[in-house]
Amino acid sequence: MFEDKPHAEGAAVVAAAGEALQALCQELNLDEGSAAEALDDFTAIRGNYSLEGEVTHWLACSLYVACRKSIIPTVGKGIMEGNCVSLTRILRSAKLSLIQFFSKMKKWMDMSNLPQEFRERIERLERNFEVSTVIFKKYEPIFLDIFQNPYEEPPKLPRSRKQRRIPCSVKDLFNFCWTLFVYTKGNFRMIGDDLVNSYHLLLCCLDLIFANAIMCPNRQDLLNPSFKGLPSDFHTADFTASEEPPCIIAVLCELHDGLLVEAKGIKEHYFKPYISKLFDRKILKGECLLDLSSFTDNSKAVNKEYEEYVLTVGDFDERIFLGADAEEEIGTPRKFTRDTPLGKLTAQANVEYNLQQHFEKKRSFAPSTPLTGRRYLREKEAVITPVASATQSVSRLQSIVAGLKNAPSDQLINIFESCVRNPVENIMKILKGIGETFCQHYTQSTDEQPGSHIDFAVNRLKLAEILYYKILETVMVQETRRLHGMDMSVLLEQDIFHRSLMACCLEIVLFAYSSPRTFPWIIEVLNLQPFYFYKVIEVVIRSEEGLSRDMVKHLNSIEEQILESLAWSHDSALWEALQVSANKVPTCEEVIFPNNFETGNGGNVQGHLPLMPMSPLMHPRVKEVRTDSGSLRRDMQPLSPISVHERYSSPTAGSAKRRLFGEDPPKEMLMDKIITEGTKLKIAPSSSITAENVSILPGQTLLTMATAPVTGTTGHKVTIPLHGVANDAGEITLIPLSMNTNQESKVKSPVSLTAHSLIGASPKQTNLTKAQEVHSTGINRPKRTGSLALFYRKVYHLASVRLRDLCLKLDVSNELRRKIWTCFEFTLVHCPDLMKDRHLDQLLLCAFYIMAKVTKEERTFQEIMKSYRNQPQANSHVYRSVLLKSIPREVVAYNKNINDDFEMIDCDLEDATKTPDCSSGPVKEERGDLIKFYNTIYVGRVKSFALKYDLANQDHMMDAPPLSPFPHIKQQPGSPRRISQQHSIYISPHKNGSGLTPRSALLYKFNGSPSKSLKDINNMIRQGEQRTKKRVIAIDSDAESPAKRVCQENDDVLLKRLQDVVSERANH
C-alpha cells in the first residue's frame, strides 16, 4: 500500500487533490475553513505516506474529519458540532462506499494519529452501520412475508402534475415503513441503543403498517394472502375489519426470532406513545396512514424530519439501503427480481461477498475465538443470523434464570447462616450500591452514547442479580464440599469478590442484548480494577453451564484484554502488588504447574500442538465424562483447578479490606520473622489435631510445609519443616504429619518452643526431615502461589499460546522458540516497567525479532507482522501506537546503547508504521510505531541479554543463562466424547495397530484432481491393493527408519500442515 514516489509526482498529486477537493466542496456547498483544513491534513499525510488508490477517497476521509471538527454557533444551544454535511453526502460525492470508507478511515486515523475519542466515534458509527445492515437484511424477508413483493410490481407509468393521486404501491409502502423505523430509532435512541431493541422496534413498525393495511378500505391488496397472521375470515367474501386494529407482534416473534415480552413492552410503553406524539405534531395525518389522501403527505413529512435529524444529530443516512445504487454506495445487495440480468446478479454476489468479509473482520455480533479460549467451548451451533443469535442469547439468558428471583435461595441462606459472621447484610449493601451506580450511568447520556430508559436499566439489573445469586450458590456449594464444611466467612466477606462477580453478570446481560456499552464500560462505571476483575471470569465460565459459545468467547476475550494490556496501565493495582512483593516478578517456572512444561530441550511433539484438539468436532468447556461406566455428576466435580479461595486468598479476615489482593509473603519470609523475633511455637498432640482435619478460623494462617533455615552456634545450617497454623497473637501451633509405621513418633504433651531452642537442632533428626521431604514431593504445586502468581501464570500461558502460534506459522525451530521465550520472560521479570501502559504483544514481537536476529535465523518484520495479523486479537493500534515516552529521559537513557546491527528495519512496512510524534491526552506521552519503540527503547534494555545467545560469540555463550522452560498446552480430555448436545453421539480415536498410508499413495482432491486419479484409486481397491508393495511404516514402531528420521527432522513442517487442517475443519 505504501510506496515511495518521486517528489515531482507527489506535487502533481497534491495539485490534483486541490482541484478534486474544490470540486467536492462546491458540490457539497462546504465552507472554506473546513476545505482548507482538509487540504492541509491531506498534504501533511501525503508528505509522509504514499496513498494508494483514488485521491478523492482519501480526500473524503480528510474532509469528514474536518467537518466533524467544525463548530457552528446556534441561536438556542450555543454551538453545534459539525457543519450540516452528512457522511452519506460526502461519500456519495466522492463515489466511496461505506465499507471502503471504514477501511480507509482506520488507516487515515493511524496515519494522522487522531485522538481516541474520534476513533471511538468511528467505531460507534461503524457499529450503527452494522446494526442497520443486519436489521435491513431481516426487514426484507419479513416484509415479503406480510405484504406483496415490491419487486414484482409493474413499473409506474409517467404522469403529469395535474393527474389525480394514485394509491401507494407496495414499493412505496416498503420505503415508508423503513423510513419510519429509522426515524423513530434515531429520535428514540433510548430504545434503539442495541440490536435486540432495534429489531423489536422494527417489528412494531411492521405491525403498525399491517394494521393500517387491514383497517384501510381497499388497501388489503397490499397484503400477502398466505401470511399466517391474517384474520381467520380474511379470505371470505364478507370480511370486514374489526374496529380495534389487529396486533401481529406475537406472530412475528414466533416466525422471525423475536422475544414476545420484549417486543410488547416496547410497543405499549414506547412506540405507541411516540406515534401518538407524531400525530399531535401533525407529522402523521389521517385516520389511516395508507389512505389515498394522506399517504403522500405522511411519507414526505417523515422523510423531511429524518433529513433534519441526519444533518443535525446523525451521521449515517440509513435510507441509503433503499436507493437504486445501494450496492455501490454501501455494499448491501437489494432483493432482486427473477428477471434480473446475470451480470447484475454477479455484481450483487460480489457486493454481498465484500459485506460478508467486512463483518467477518469486524466480528461485532459473533466474536472470534481467542487463542486461549478454545478449550472451554462447546460444539458449534447451527449457522444463524445475527438477529436470531442476539434474540436467542437473550432467550438463553432468560431460560437460565427462569423460575429464580433476585434474592438468595434457601440453600444459599443456609450457607450464609453457617458462617461465623452472616454476610447477607453486607452482600445486600454491595449489590444495592452497584445497582444504583449501574442505573445512573446506564440512563445518563454521554458523548459516547445516549442514555437509555430507566426501565431498561432496571430490567438488565434484575437479570444480572438473579444470575449473580445463581452463580454464587453454585460456587459456594462446590467450595463447601471441596473444603469439607470449612467456614466461608473469609471469602464471603471480601467485597471485591462480590463486586467482580456482579460486574461479570452485568457484562453477560449487556452482551446478550448486544448493547453498545462494551467492555470495559462496566468496570469503568463500577470503578473496578481490571487486575481484580479477571479472577472471576474463569469461575463464572466453569460454574454456569448455560452460557452460549459466543458468551464464553466474549468472556475469554475480556480476560485476554486484561492480561495483555488493561492490567498493565500505569494506575493498575498490579504495580501495588509488585511493590508488596518487593518487586520480585515471578518467573514462568515459579508459577506454572511443574507437569505443564514441555520435556527436553526441544520440547515434546505433544506440547507443540496448541490448537489441535483430539477432535475438531467439540471443544468441551467443562470436562465431562458422559459414559455409563464412568459418569460423574456435575455438581460433584470441582469448579476449577484453582479454587475460589485460592484466587481470593487473604492473610486474615481482619486485614482483608486493606490487603485483599496483596501477594502473600513467602513462607520463608514468615519463618525468618519467627526466628528473629523468637515467636512462640506449640506442638499439638496428634490426637487432638492433624493435618487432615484442621480447620482454619478467621485470624489464622495456614502454614503448609514451610521451612525455616536456622544457623546454629557452630555455623551449620539446618532446615526444619513446619506444618501448622499461625494466629493473631503471633503463636504457631505445629501440626504433626502422618508418619510411616517404622518412623512412628508420638508427642505426649504440647511442648512450648522458641526459636532459640531450635538453634541446637541435632543432625540425628534427619529421618524426620527426609520423611517430610518425601511427603512434600507428592504435592504438585507451583513454587509461588497467591494473587500475583495467579496473574503471571495466566500471562505466561497467554503469551506462550500466541508465541507458539506465531512460530508454527513461520516454521520456527523449537530451539529458537525457546530463546524467544527466554528473552520475553527476561523482559517481564527484569524490565517490568517496559510493560507499563503497553501491550503484551509488543514485547512478544520485539523478542521474536531480536532473537531471530541474534541467532541468524532471521525473519523480516513484514513476515512477523503478516503472521501476527492473522491472530484473532490482532489490532493495528497495537503496532502503530506504542508508548515511547511518558517520563522524561526514558528514551534518551538508552539511546547510547543501541547497535546498528540490531536496528529493526523493514522497507516494506517502515513507512506504513511511521507515526507523527504528538501528545494524546492530558498525560504527557509520546507515541510511535513498534519499530521506533524497538530501536529507541527495547534494544537498549535487552541487547546485552540477547547477545548471550549469539552462536558466533563464544564468550557470550559461556554467560548465557539456561533457556526457560516452555509451557505446553494440555490436550483435550480422552474419549469417548459427545459431539452434540442434541443427540447421543460419541466418538473415540480409532484403536488400530496397522500402519499409516505412505505418502506415495494415490491422492484425489475433490474439485481439484483429474478423474483419472479417482479411477486409479478404484482400480487399486478392486485389485485388493496389490500394487502397494512398499514397506508400511508403523506408527507405534520403535524401530528407526529413514522415513521416520525425515519426519522428525521436519516436524515443524508436518505440525504446521496438521495445524492448517485442523484450522480449516474448525472454520467449517
Swiss-Prot record:
For this UniProt entry, the molecular function terms from Gene Ontology, in alphabetical order, are: promoter-specific chromatin binding; RNA polymerase II transcription regulatory region sequence-specific DNA binding
Q: CDD domains recorded for this chain?
A: CYCLIN_RBL1 (cd20605)
Which keywords does this chain's UniProt record carry? Cell cycle, Chromatin regulator, Host-virus interaction, Nucleus, Phosphoprotein, Repressor, Transcription, Transcription regulation, Tumor suppressor
Q: What do the Gene Ontology cellular component annotations say? A: chromatin; nucleoplasm; transcription regulator complex
PTM Phosphoserine: list the residues.
Answer: S640, S650, S749, S762, S964, S975, S988, S1009, S1041
User: Matching Gene3D superfamilies, A to Z?
Assistant: 1.10.472.140, Cyclin-like
Q: Which GO terms describe its biological process?
A: cell differentiation; chromatin organization; negative regulation of cellular senescence; negative regulation of G1/S transition of mitotic cell cycle; negative regulation of gene expression; negative regulation of transcription by RNA polymerase II; regulation of lipid kinase activity
Region entry Domain A: which residue ranges?
Answer: 385-584
Processing and modification events after translation: Cell-cycle arrest properties are inactivated by phosphorylation on Thr-332, Ser-640, Ser-964 and Ser-975 by CDK4.
Q: Which residues carry this modification: Phosphothreonine?
A: T332, T369, T385, T997
Region annotation Pocket: where it falls in the sequence = 385-949
**Descriptive protein name:** Retinoblastoma-like protein 1
Which organism does this sequence originate in? Homo sapiens (Human)
Its gene? RBL1
